Protein backbone atom coordinates (compact mmCIF):
# COMPACT_ATOMS: atom_id res chain seq x y z
CA UNK A 1 0.00 0.00 0.00
CA UNK A 2 1.47 3.43 -0.94
CA UNK A 3 2.48 5.75 1.87
CA UNK A 4 -0.28 8.35 2.06
CA UNK A 5 0.93 11.80 3.14
CA UNK A 6 -1.47 13.66 5.39
CA UNK A 7 -1.84 17.43 5.32
CA UNK A 8 -0.04 19.30 8.07
CA UNK A 9 -2.70 21.30 9.96
CA UNK A 10 -0.10 23.90 10.95
CA UNK A 11 0.42 24.93 7.32
CA UNK A 12 -2.89 26.82 7.32
CA UNK A 13 -1.46 29.04 10.07
CA UNK A 14 1.06 30.49 7.61
CA UNK A 15 -0.86 33.11 5.64
CA UNK A 16 -0.24 34.28 2.11
CA UNK A 17 -0.08 38.03 1.45
CA UNK A 18 -1.52 39.70 -1.64
CA UNK A 19 -1.88 43.21 -3.06
CA UNK A 20 -5.55 44.23 -3.31
CA UNK A 21 -7.43 47.49 -3.70
CA UNK A 22 -9.43 48.85 -0.76
CA UNK A 23 -12.56 49.07 -2.96
CA UNK A 24 -13.53 45.66 -1.53
CA UNK A 25 -14.20 47.39 1.80
CA UNK A 26 -17.29 49.32 2.86
CA UNK A 27 -16.69 53.13 2.85
CA UNK A 28 -13.30 52.81 1.06
CA UNK A 29 -11.94 53.83 -2.34
CA UNK A 30 -8.78 52.62 -4.09
CA UNK A 31 -6.39 54.97 -2.25
CA UNK A 32 -2.77 55.97 -2.85
CA UNK A 33 0.16 53.58 -2.98
CA UNK A 34 -0.09 49.81 -2.77
CA UNK A 35 -2.21 47.97 -0.18
CA UNK A 36 -1.19 44.48 0.97
CA UNK A 37 -3.60 42.22 2.86
CA UNK A 38 -1.85 40.13 5.52
CA UNK A 39 -4.91 38.70 7.30
CA UNK A 40 -8.59 38.81 6.40
CA UNK A 41 -11.59 36.54 6.01
CA UNK A 42 -10.19 35.16 2.73
CA UNK A 43 -6.86 33.80 4.02
CA UNK A 44 -7.65 33.60 7.76
CA UNK A 45 -11.39 32.87 8.23
CA UNK A 46 -10.77 31.12 11.55
CA UNK A 47 -8.78 34.08 12.88
CA UNK A 48 -9.95 37.24 14.60
CA UNK A 49 -7.42 39.75 13.27
CA UNK A 50 -7.70 41.80 10.07
CA UNK A 51 -4.33 43.30 9.05
CA UNK A 52 -3.21 45.35 6.04
CA UNK A 53 -0.21 47.51 5.20
CA UNK A 54 -0.25 50.32 2.65
CA UNK A 55 2.99 51.65 1.13
CA UNK A 56 2.97 55.25 -0.11
CA UNK A 57 5.73 57.26 -1.77
CA UNK A 58 6.22 60.99 -2.21
CA UNK A 59 2.80 62.09 -0.98
CA UNK A 60 2.64 65.87 -1.48
CA UNK A 61 -0.97 66.77 -0.62
CA UNK A 62 -3.73 65.46 1.66
CA UNK A 63 -5.71 62.68 0.03
CA UNK A 64 -8.54 60.86 1.78
CA UNK A 65 -9.83 57.54 0.49
CA UNK A 66 -11.79 56.32 3.51
CA UNK A 67 -15.13 57.76 4.64
CA UNK A 68 -15.61 58.34 8.39
CA UNK A 69 -16.82 55.11 9.97
CA UNK A 70 -16.69 53.03 13.14
CA UNK A 71 -16.16 49.40 14.12
CA UNK A 72 -17.67 47.17 16.78
CA UNK A 73 -14.15 46.21 17.90
CA UNK A 74 -10.89 47.96 18.73
CA UNK A 75 -8.30 48.67 16.04
CA UNK A 76 -4.81 50.10 15.76
CA UNK A 77 -3.21 52.34 13.12
CA UNK A 78 0.58 52.31 12.77
CA UNK A 79 2.36 55.03 10.78
CA UNK A 80 6.00 54.26 9.88
CA UNK A 81 8.06 56.58 7.69
CA UNK A 82 10.62 55.32 5.18
CA UNK A 83 13.64 56.86 6.95
CA UNK A 84 15.89 54.62 9.11
CA UNK A 85 14.47 56.24 12.27
CA UNK A 86 10.93 55.61 10.93
CA UNK A 87 10.25 59.34 10.35
CA UNK A 88 9.21 60.70 6.98
CA UNK A 89 5.45 60.20 6.81
CA UNK A 90 2.87 62.77 7.85
CA UNK A 91 -0.81 61.97 8.11
CA UNK A 92 -3.96 63.13 9.82
CA UNK A 93 -6.43 61.06 11.81
CA UNK A 94 -9.98 62.23 12.33
CA UNK A 95 -11.93 61.36 15.47
CA UNK A 96 -15.56 62.39 15.35
CA UNK A 97 -15.24 65.68 13.36
CA UNK A 98 -11.75 66.83 14.39
CA UNK A 99 -8.46 66.18 12.53
CA UNK A 100 -5.27 65.40 14.50
CA UNK A 101 -1.78 65.63 12.92
CA UNK A 102 0.35 62.48 12.99
CA UNK A 103 4.11 62.40 12.36
CA UNK A 104 5.72 58.98 12.07
CA UNK A 105 6.58 56.87 13.87
CA UNK A 106 3.28 56.77 15.69
CA UNK A 107 0.54 54.34 16.69
CA UNK A 108 -3.09 55.37 17.09
CA UNK A 109 -5.58 53.31 19.09
CA UNK A 110 -9.16 53.35 17.81
CA UNK A 111 -11.62 52.24 20.52
CA UNK A 112 -14.70 50.27 19.53
CA UNK A 113 -17.49 52.62 18.41
CA UNK A 114 -15.18 55.63 17.77
CA UNK A 115 -15.94 57.42 14.47
CA UNK A 116 -12.65 57.82 12.60
CA UNK A 117 -10.79 58.05 9.31
CA UNK A 118 -7.30 59.03 8.16
CA UNK A 119 -5.47 60.61 5.26
CA UNK A 120 -1.86 60.90 4.15
CA UNK A 121 -0.50 64.45 4.07
CA UNK A 122 3.17 64.28 3.08
CA UNK A 123 6.11 61.93 2.67
CA UNK A 124 6.76 58.23 2.19
CA UNK A 125 6.27 55.19 4.36
CA UNK A 126 3.88 52.55 5.61
CA UNK A 127 0.44 52.56 7.19
CA UNK A 128 -0.63 49.45 9.08
CA UNK A 129 -4.25 48.79 10.08
CA UNK A 130 -4.95 46.04 12.59
CA UNK A 131 -8.59 45.37 13.46
CA UNK A 132 -9.86 42.82 15.98
CA UNK A 133 -12.86 41.25 14.28
CA UNK A 134 -14.45 37.77 14.31
CA UNK A 135 -13.40 35.71 11.32
CA UNK A 136 -10.99 38.49 10.28
CA UNK A 137 -13.95 40.02 8.41
CA UNK A 138 -13.47 43.81 8.26
CA UNK A 139 -16.77 44.57 6.52
CA UNK A 140 -18.73 42.74 9.22
CA UNK A 141 -17.74 45.39 11.78
CA UNK A 142 -18.10 48.64 9.76
CA UNK A 143 -20.93 51.04 10.59
Regions found by a protein language model. Give the residues of each.
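Double-stranded beta-helix
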Residues: 1-21, 121-143
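Short, loop-centered acidic/histidine patches that primarily coordinate divalent metals
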Residues: 81, 96-98, 113, 121, ...
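A short, N-terminal "cap"/entry segment at the start of jelly-roll beta-barrel domains
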Residues: 1-66
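Short Gly/Pro-enriched loop/turn and capping motifs at secondary-structure junctions
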Residues: 83-85, 115-116, 136-137
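A short beta-strand-loop-beta hairpin characteristic of the jelly-roll/cupin
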Residues: 77-104, 140-143
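Conserved metal-binding segment of the jelly-roll/cupin
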Residues: 101-122
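A short beta-loop-beta micro-motif enriched in histidine and acidic residues
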Residues: 61-77, 87, 95
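Ordered hydrophobic segments in well-structured contexts
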Residues: 37, 50-55, 75-80, 92, ...
Amino acid sequence: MPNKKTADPNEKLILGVEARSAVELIKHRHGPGVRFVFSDNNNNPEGNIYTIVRFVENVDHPEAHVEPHQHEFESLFIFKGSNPDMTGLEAEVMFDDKWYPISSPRAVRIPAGKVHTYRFVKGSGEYWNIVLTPGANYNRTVK
